[in-house]
C-alpha cells in the first residue's frame, strides 16, 4: 500500500492503541517517510506492528475475521464482517465519542444498512469488489 495512506491512518487514530501507542504510530509513519518507501508491503507492515502490540492484536483479529468467511459472498454477509473487522481494529478508537464522531458512527451504520440492501442486485462479490461497492 501507499505509505502516505498507512501513515495518515496511523496518525488519525480511531484504532486499537490510539491513546497508549499513538507516539509509536507517529514514529512508524515518520520512519517510513524518512526511508522514502514507495510501497508498504506486508513484511513492512508486520515489522511496524511489532512496535504497536495493541494495534497488532487488533490487526490479527481483524484479518482472522476477514479470512474466516467465504471468499465470495453477498453484501448482506459482507456487511457484518466489515463491522466486526472494524471493531476488532478498535474502531472508532479509544477516546469517548464526541458529537461529530457519534454522527459518523450513525452514518456508517446507515451506509452498511444500504450496502446490505444491495445483496439481491449485486450478487456474490469477492472482498475487493465488496469494499469498492461499499
What do the predicted segments below correspond to?
Residues 1-134:
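Polyanion-engaging groove/track-forming segments
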Amino acid at each position: 500500500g501507499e505509505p502516505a495512506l498507512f501513515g495518515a491512518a496511523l496518525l488519525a487514530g480511531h484504532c486499537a492503541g490510539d491513546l497508549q501507542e499513538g507516539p509509536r504510530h507517529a514514529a512508524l509513519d515518520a520512519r517510513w517517510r524518512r526511508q522514502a518507501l514507495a510501497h508498504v508491503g506486508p513484511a513492512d507492515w508486520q515489522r511496524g506492528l511489532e512496535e504497536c502490540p495493541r494495534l497488532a492484536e487488533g490487526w490479527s483479529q481483524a484479518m482472522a475475521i476477514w479470512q474466516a468467511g467465504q471468499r465470495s459472498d453477498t453484501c448482506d454477509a459482507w456487511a457484518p464482517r466489515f463491522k466486526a473487522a472494524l471493531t476488532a481494529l478498535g474502531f472508532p478508537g479509544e477516546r469517548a465519542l464526541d458529537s461529530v464522531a457519534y454522527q459518523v458512527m450513525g452514518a456508517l451504520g446507515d451506509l452498511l444498512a444500504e450496502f446490505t440492501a444491495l445483496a439481491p442486485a449485486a450478487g456474490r462479490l469477492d472482498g475487493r469488489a465488496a469494499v469498492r461497492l461499499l
